[in-house]
Each structure stands twice: as C-alpha cells, then as structure tokens.
C-alpha cells in the first residue's frame, strides 16, 4: 500500500526514531530525581505508542474528552486534561473518573473554578 492510499487520519511513524526519542526523554528525566514524565498523547492517539512512552500505564497528558476516555479504557488512569476545562465538560470528566480513573483538570478562570467546586 502506498502512503497516499492510507485512510486518514492515521498514524504513520518511524518506530526506530520514536524509540530513540523516547530513550532520550527518559535519560533526560533520569538526570533529575523527583521529575516525572507525563507524555502528551494528542498527536499519536495510540495505545501502542502510549505503551512505549508511558510504560506500565504511567501518567499521561490528553487534550480531548475522547482521548481521556480512550486512554482510560486502555488502562491509563492517571491523566491530566491539559486544556482549560469548561463547565460543560465537567460531567464527562466526572463519568470517566467514576470508573476508577484520575483525570485531573486545570483552569485559570475564577468562574470555572467555582463551577468545579460546586460540581457533584
């Protein structure tokens, strides 16, 4: 199959380059005790890549509710939703967390923080 014949979107990568880059990141983190790597999965969107980037279902970063659900379903329970949360998405995050996951959220907006605090 030719590259241009692949159905899109699809993930195409050089596995050797990926593994080399992941090893470089791990080496850099290892030089700083206490530092924890939390790779962002928004580009790869792949459990196979997550298994290499965050072995043993380590912590990851996501940027959509769909990614949070997908990776939680694959055993990645410790996540940061790295986009400022909106009140409309709190129910979805709560539902994911109700299944034993720990998707952390961020905000820099006082009104949203109040909505988070008031959310059941």
Where are these regions (language model features)?
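N-terminal glycine-rich anion-binding loops that anchor highly charged ligand groups
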Residues: 17-47, 63
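Generic N-terminal amphipathic, Lys/Arg-enriched alpha-helix
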Residues: 1-13
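Generic preference for hydrophobic/aromatic residues in regular secondary structure cores
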Residues: 11-12, 22, 103
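A short, structure-level motif marking secondary-structure boundaries and short turns
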Residues: 9-11, 33-35, 51-54
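Active-site-proximal beta-alpha core segment in soluble small-molecule metabolic enzymes
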Residues: 38-120
């Amino acid at each position: 199959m030719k590259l241009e014949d692949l159905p899109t979107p699809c993930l195409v990568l050089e596995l050797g380059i990926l593994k080399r880059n992941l090893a470089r990141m791990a080496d850099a983190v290892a030089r700083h005790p206490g530092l924890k790597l939390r790779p962002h999965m928004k580009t790869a969107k792949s459990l196979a890549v997550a298994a290499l980037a965050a072995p043993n279902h380590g912590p990851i970063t996501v940027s959509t509710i769909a990614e949070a659900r997908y990776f939680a379903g694959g055993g990645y329970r410790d996540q940061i939703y790295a986009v400022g949360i909106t009140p409309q998405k709190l129910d979805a995050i709560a539902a994911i967390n109700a299944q034993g996951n720990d998707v952390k959220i961020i905000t820099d907006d006082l009104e949203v923080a109040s909505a988070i605090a008031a959310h059941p």
